[in-house]
């Protein structure tokens, strides 16, 4: 994969105008850079030294800081030179050209690969470094730092060592069966230890993908009928004008995305086409995409128009205005759902089953009225924690207290008058904390690669049966330990290493 005998170099900072640019050199001959740039000063290890850098013709290139990290006490475990020069494109280009005369340009992730090969980090720590570089929010950085500190490595190494200990006992029986395997108590201890590991790995896998979600971002979709304020809310949360806002219904056809930070959590916010009946094939495609994205989302913000109708009963009791009754109920056409639902003023008492999505889906399917199913029903989830219900355009609302229907909270908001917006943001943060597992100290799986190996390890352990032939027992334990070792990189599998390090930038 790489020739570690070569001395490599690369720009470690972004190429462009900046105050400082850092160029890293690593390898057995890194100190040759001193002679190449005609540096005469004594360079003390781990001290910053101001030097002048000259080219082959003794022309001054720049002055900057040089730091020497002798092996093995460096990032890569090799001799490392770091040059800190002015962040000028011209200076950077000249220095890189000079270095290419004596060294080899590093491949993406090659510095980190050498650090791994020299035992400075395990694979999960290396991946943590990549995640920290990519982190855009506080919580992403916090998770990456935990991984760099060796949190996952310690957990998986402990499990792997326990398996190796069990396997050593079984291997001993193969050589000396009369000494060990005859004791029933020893059999029970081994079986209990394996079952304990099975339970621990199962619990580790049943984490609702918290770590992966935090790395990738929580997918939130804004849904609702046309012209209910979806794009206005989208632009407000994104803090910039991305979607076109118009009084004409159906402006948004395709899905728009924005990456935002709410309370330190990464959010991928999507604005979608309004859900309605249409004969326009382009709009229908947009509606289809909206429903699909809503189904796949981690969280939905579902909008209904408030449209104040001077409902005295609402002002007095907090009940929802009749117009919203109509808005919500019209999906249940021609008494296919519940006659009580269609009665204006019913206020969705216990007879109303609108908020039971699975019930709506089944009932509408029985009566062949799929076109009337709202997007909330098409999501096919009965977990109301996955949806935030919002009454939009509530410009005339007296207060921003939640309105309850059948125990479901609907939040009135007005972007124009900034009513309920802070409450909505707080609610999104609360939902994100629930999804990500706020402030949990338990190590979490952060990549699909980890999850795949853990699943395979679990499969081998679940096949463990103390009554099986001893050779099969030993093989299952060996394979389970192999999968755990693959996560942290104890085994030498080039496909795994290529997959991990190919995603790094050059210079890291």
UniProtKB/Swiss-Prot annotation:
Disulfide bonds: none annotated. This is tRNA modification GTPase MnmE. One of its GO terms (biological process) is tRNA wobble uridine modification. Its cofactor is K(+). NCBIfam families: mnmE_trmE_thdF, PRK05291.1-3, small_GTP. One of its GO terms (molecular function) is metal ion binding. Belongs to the TRAFAC class TrmE-Era-EngA-EngB-Septin-like GTPase superfamily. TrmE GTPase family. The lineage of its organism: Bacteria, Pseudomonadati, Pseudomonadota, Alphaproteobacteria, Rickettsiales. Keywords: Cytoplasm, GTP-binding, Hydrolase, Magnesium, Metal-binding, Nucleotide-binding, Potassium, tRNA processing. It is found in: Cytoplasm.
């Amino acid at each position: 994969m790489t020739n570690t005998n070569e001395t490599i170099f690369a720009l470690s900072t972004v190429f462009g105008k900046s105050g400082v640019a850092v160029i890293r050199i690593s390898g057995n001959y890194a100190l040759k850079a001193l002679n190449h740039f005609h540096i005469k000063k004594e360079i003390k290890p781990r001290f910053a030294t101001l030097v002048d850098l000259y080219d082959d013709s003794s022309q001054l290139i720049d002055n900057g800081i040089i730091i020497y990290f002798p092996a093995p006490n460096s990032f890569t475990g090799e001799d490392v030179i770091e040059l800190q020069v002015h962040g000028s494109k011209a200076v950077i280009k000249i220095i890189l050209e000079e270095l290419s005369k004596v060294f080899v340009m590093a491949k993406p992730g090659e510095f980190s690969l050498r650090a791994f090969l020299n035992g400075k980090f395990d694979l999960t720590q290396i991946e943590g470094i990549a995640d920290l570089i990519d982190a855009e929010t506080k919580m992403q950085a916090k998770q990456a730092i935990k991984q760099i500190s060796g949190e996952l490595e310690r957990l998986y190494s402990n499990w792997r060592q326990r398996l190796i200990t069990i396997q050593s006992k079984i291997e001993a029986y193969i050589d000396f069966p009369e000494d060990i395997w005859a004791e029933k108590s020893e059999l029970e201890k081994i079986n209990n230890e394996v079952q304990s590991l099975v339970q621990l790995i199962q619990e580790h896998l049943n984490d609702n993908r918290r770590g992966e979600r935090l790395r990738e971002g929580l997918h939130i979709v804004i849904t609702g009928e046309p012209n209910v304020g979806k794009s206005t809310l989208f632009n407000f949360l994104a803090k910039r004008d991305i979607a076109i806002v118009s009084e004409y219904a159906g402006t948004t056809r395709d899905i728009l995305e924005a990456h935002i930070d709410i309370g330190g959590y990464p959010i991928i916010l999507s604005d979608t086409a309004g859900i309605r009946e249409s004969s326009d094939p382009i709009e229908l495609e947009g509606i289809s995409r909206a429903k699909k994205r809503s189904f796949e989302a981690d969280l939905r913000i579902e909008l209904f128009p408030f449209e104040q109708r001077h409902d005295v009963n609402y002002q007095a009791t907090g009940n929802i205005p009749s117009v919203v009754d109509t808005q919500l109920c019209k999906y249940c056409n021609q008494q296919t759902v519940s006659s009580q639902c269609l009665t204006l003023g019913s206020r969705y008492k216990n007879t109303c089953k609108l908020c039971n999505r699975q019930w709506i889906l089944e009932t509408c399917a029985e009566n062949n009225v799929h076109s009337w199913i709202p997007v909330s029903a098409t999501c096919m989830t009965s977990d109301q924690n996955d949806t935030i219900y919002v009454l939009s355009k509530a410009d005339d609302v007296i207060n921003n207290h939640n309105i309850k229907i059948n125990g479901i909270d609907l939040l009135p908001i007005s972007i124009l008058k900034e009513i309920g917006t802070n409450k909505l943001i707080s609610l999104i943060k609360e939902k994100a904390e629930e999804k990500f597992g706020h402030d949990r100290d338990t190590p979490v799986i952060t990549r699909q690669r980890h999850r795949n190996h853990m699943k395979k390890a679990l499969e081998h352990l679940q096949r463990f049966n103390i009554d099986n032939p001893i050779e099969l027992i030993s093989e299952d334990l060996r394979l389970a330990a192999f999968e755990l070792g693959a996560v942290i990189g104890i085994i030498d599998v080039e496909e795994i290493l290529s997959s991990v390090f190919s995603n790094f930038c050059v210079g890291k």
